[in-house]
Amino acid sequence: MRKDLPIYRISIDLENPKTTVSFNSLVSNPAHEKSFQTFSKVQRYEFNDEKQIVTGVAISADFPIYRKQGNEEFYVVFDKQAISDIVVDYARKGNFNNLNVEHKSNDVVNNAFMVMLYQIDNEKGFTAPERFKDESDGSLLVSYKILDKEVYERAKNGELTGFSIEGDFVIEELMKETENEFLTQVIEDLKSMLK
């Protein structure tokens, strides 16, 4: 991570109907760099063609995501509160089953259903499941049952590897002091994960 780039916090404003998360997308290269997994009844990492369920990280809390728009390079992060607000927004707008492929509005997966949504919240005792033990507090995990066999096969064969959310967000630059505090916290979190 380059320290000289600005960091922006992404959030939604629950009072502003224009900010929302409208879709989750199955993508080949998730920005948070976390691939999803498929689960069987008995063995943890095998595919179960009857269930056709994929599980993974939808949003990784406090994970700096590199972005480049035009000549500007920067990082964006979702903090725990922003992710909590996204969950509320998802629920009140009924967007749980909105799933597409590679953020293409013309490639909506009509036969997919969210069957699990779980936000890690250590304070409340909602700790990370063993498979996701290295995920940050506040991260959001989801599972989709995908009945569309073609899309499921694309996930199974590794063409689609993870989730990526899409929507309209509030983006604010973190102050320099906050940026340094944030980077220090990220470094400490990474160190603790490596222990």
What do the predicted segments below correspond to?
Residues 1-195:
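Signature of dsDNA virion morphogenesis modules
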